[in-house]
Amino acid sequence: LMGRLSASHSNHDKLYQNLYASAYDAANNTATLDGYVDTTKRKTSIFSYDLTGEFETAGITHSITVGAEYLETDNDNDRYHANFLPDYNSDPDTEVFTIARPLNISGNVGVNNDGNTTTNYYTGANRVNADMTFADIKVLSFYLNDEIALTDSLDLVLGARFDNMDIDVTGTTTGADEDDTISPRVGMILDLTEQASVYASFSETFAPKAGDQYAKVSANDEKIDPNTFENLEFGIKYDLPIGLTFTAAYFEVEANKPEYDVATMTSTMVKSDITGFELELIGSLTDQWFVSAGYTNLDAKADGGNPLREAPEDMFSIWNNYSVSDRLAVNLGIIYQGESVIKTGSSAILPDYTRVDAGASYALTENTTVQLNVENLTDELYFPHSHSTHQASVGAPINAMLSITSKF
């Protein structure tokens, strides 16, 4: 038997703020701006221990893993409303601006549609605290996995995981949830030849919330309920003679996840069915050239037949890494994502986009490497995500990061 103990602790401090168009008046060519600042302080501790070993029964080899995991998160979330002063529309949370490109506001100071200067206060004595929420999340898990070598070419995988999740939310709004779930897993792997194998698997997955956002929780809200998934998958893996490995997989996923409705400011569980397939090529074409390419096709529908939010039909990526010398390597990648609806049942879409990334690394010594990564090389304007139909996230423009990594 071999035991493994793991412990980790993280401190997370995040702030994001947003000004967005909450209303539009076509007749007067104006837009009403609303906004918020959200701060999150989170501490997470994770402890896990597992045992692995092998034994035989009646000539059949079992590879066993058994373990336990405990997660605890303390989450402190504050939200502050926009506060436009002087207040010209009897609602300091919003202000009306004439539509122009760019809009006449910068650094939270702007001129409204009547020509009056107004300032939005996110900090200082004039800021307005809209919500204070404290969340305590505890998850205790036990798991068992057995890989059984039935023959030299056939393996059976059996497993199960028990999760107990307890979430307690207090503050401006309150809520609580406790769930006990057993998630089974079964799979089979058949080696057809030394180069080819096929597999099939079924699993249920229970995904507790990780403590990111718990603001505006009501007693009957499903926002803090866990995500649940049923996954059925089968596929093939083949080692090509040119140094690449090809994999193809078909999958069906039945998911239950809470989806937030901006209009009602509550979350409801949305059941969805996702079917699709994945194709992947990965490996080394030469001693110097490594390539990874993948394509995914999705057919994602909610229970009523509407397209599922942010589930594009087509996704493609390719990544190349070329070793110029023992010390210098360069890389180039392309990511494509097809269009998707912003909200389940909505006709508003996030348009498709293509992003090009590049980079280079140089080994200064055996243990120290300097690396330059450039994201969005062509400075593509794209929208990877949207909170709602009027709050789309803009992808970062061309940017670069230089890092030095040392191993001790």
What spans do the regions from the language model cover?
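Gram-negative outer-membrane beta-barrel transporters
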Residues: 152-153, 249-254, 267-344, 378-381, ...
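Membrane-embedded beta-barrel scaffold of Gram-negative outer-membrane proteins
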Residues: 1-8, 12-18, 191, 197-199, ...
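Surface-exposed extracellular loop regions of Gram-negative outer-membrane beta-barrel proteins
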Residues: 74-76, 166, 176, 189-233, ...
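Transmembrane beta-strands of outer-membrane beta-barrel proteins
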Residues: 1-5, 62-68, 156-158, 198, ...
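Face-selective signature of the C-terminal outer-membrane beta-barrel domain
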Residues: 1-12, 35-170
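Outer-membrane beta-barrel channels and translocator barrels
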Residues: 1, 52, 56-59, 151-153, ...
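Residues on the lipid-exposed face of transmembrane beta-strands in outer-membrane beta-barrel proteins
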Residues: 49-53, 142-148, 186-190, 234-238, ...
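C-terminal beta-signal and adjacent terminal beta-strands/loops
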Residues: 339-343, 361-408
